């Protein structure tokens, strides 16, 4: 009897350390799998830069920043953002509208995003890095405890387990970018997402979907990037899309053909 009880408790403990199946489905309603872009349609430069962005490059992460400075009306310039970077001092954040800027300019904000220097236009030349979105309000946006986001992942229709620690946030309202950066890093590490076929990059198409209980879902074609360099590859985050982290989960669909 004691052995049976111990076995049951061990099973429960192991289950809680991985992402459960949460309101998932084997196919996304947002984008048909046949419409997903194939990895072979990306140029080699773009594929290499996607790998660099999501796996190797450090991210801009900070809390409780404030700035009234701008370069253009759809930007906010954070002077002295980098304190120990080899090249950059300032961070120029670009949004797709002035309305978004007005929500954050002069307010206490938190930042989490992928930044780049090559082809960054604005600020002090060679001393300013650029980033699209990645901004949330600081005040009254902190969870009482860190949120670990459950992930459902299917590879060619077969569900694979994803550790529950893979994607997490301490924010009530979080940018999709923050969650997406963490998820794609895992996909690169586990599945060589942005490797070429020669270097064991077996995944040929993919879709990531961010679901919440109260808002429309947000989805990205994992190989749907435009252009070759960070200034265009990262433009999907320019809308600074945020979602409520409560009762949310992520669905990922990967295909090897």
Swiss-Prot record:
Example GO CC term: the record gives:
extracellular region
Q: Which UniProt keywords apply?
A: Disulfide bond, Enterotoxin, Metal-binding, Secreted, Signal, Superantigen, Toxin, Zinc
- Tell me the SUPFAM superfamilies matching this sequence: Bacterial enterotoxins (SSF50203), Superantigen toxins, C-terminal domain (SSF54334)
Q: Which family does it belong to?
A: Belongs to the staphylococcal/streptococcal toxin family.
| Residue pairs linked by disulfide bridges in the UniProt entry | 120-130
Known outcome of mutating residue 211 to A: Almost 10-fold reduction of the binding to major histocompatibility complex (MHC) class II
| Cofactor(s) this protein requires | Zn(2+)
Domain of life from the UniProt record: Bacteria
Organism encoding this protein: Staphylococcus aureus
Q: Name one GO molecular function term.
A: toxin activity
- Please give the chief subcellular localization of this protein: secreted
- A Pfam cross-reference name: Stap_Strp_tox_C
Organismal lineage: Bacteria, Bacillati, Bacillota, Bacilli, Bacillales
Cofactor info, note text: Binds 1 zinc ion per subunit. The zinc ion is necessary for the toxin interaction with MHC class II.
Indicate the segments annotated as coiled coil, or none if absent: none
Where, subcellularly, is it found?
Secreted
Secretion signal span: 1-24
Write down what this protein is called: Enterotoxin type A
Something else known: This toxin seems to be coded by a bacteriophage.
Function field: Staphylococcal enterotoxin that activates the host immune system by binding as unprocessed molecules to major histocompatibility (MHC) complex class II and T-cell receptor (TCR) molecules. In turn, waves of cellular activation, cytokine production, and migration into the lung tissue and airways occur via alphabeta T-cells. Also causes the intoxication staphylococcal food poisoning syndrome. The illness is characterized by high fever, hypotension, diarrhea, shock, and in some cases death.
| Ligand binding (Zn(2+)) | 211, 249, 251
Query: What interactions and quaternary structure are annotated?
Result: Monomer. Interacts with MHC class II molecules alpha/HLA-DRB1 and beta/HLA-DRA chains. The interaction with MHC-II molecules occurs at both zinc-dependent and zinc-independent sites. Interacts with T-cell receptor beta variable 7-9/TRBV7-9.
């Amino acid at each position: 009897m004691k052995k049976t009880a111990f076995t049951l408790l061990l099973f429960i403990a192991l289950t809680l350390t991985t992402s459960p199946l949460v309101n998932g489905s084997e196919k996304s309603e947002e984008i048909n799998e046949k419409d997903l872009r194939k990895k072979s349609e990306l140029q080699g430069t773009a594929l290499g830069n996607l790998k660099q962005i999501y796996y190797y490059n450090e991210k801009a992460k900070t809390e409780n920043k404030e700035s009234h400075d701008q370069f253009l009306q759809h930007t906010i310039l954070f002077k002295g953002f980098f304190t120990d970077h080899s090249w950059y001092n300032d961070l120029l954040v670009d949004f797709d509208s002035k309305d978004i800027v007005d929500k954050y300019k002069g307010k206490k904000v938190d930042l989490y995003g992928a930044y780049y220097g090559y082809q960054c236009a604005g600020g002090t030349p060679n001393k300013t890095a650029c980033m699209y979105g990645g901004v949330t309000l600081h005040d009254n946006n902190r969870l009482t405890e860190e949120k670990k986001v459950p992930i459902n992942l299917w590879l060619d229709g077969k569900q694979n387990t994803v550790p529950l620690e893979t994607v997490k946030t301490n924010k009530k309202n979080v940018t999709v970018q923050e969650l997406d950066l963490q998820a794609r890093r895992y996909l690169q590490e586990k599945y060589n997402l942005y490797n070429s076929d020669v270097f064991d990059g077996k995944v040929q198409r993919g879709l990531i979907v961010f679901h919440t209980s109260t808002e429309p879902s947000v989805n990205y074609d994992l190989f749907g990037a435009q252009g070759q360099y960070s200034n265009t590859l990262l433009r999907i985050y320019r809308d600074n899309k945020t979602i409520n982290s409560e009762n949310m989960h992520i669905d990922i669909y990967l295909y090897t053909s």
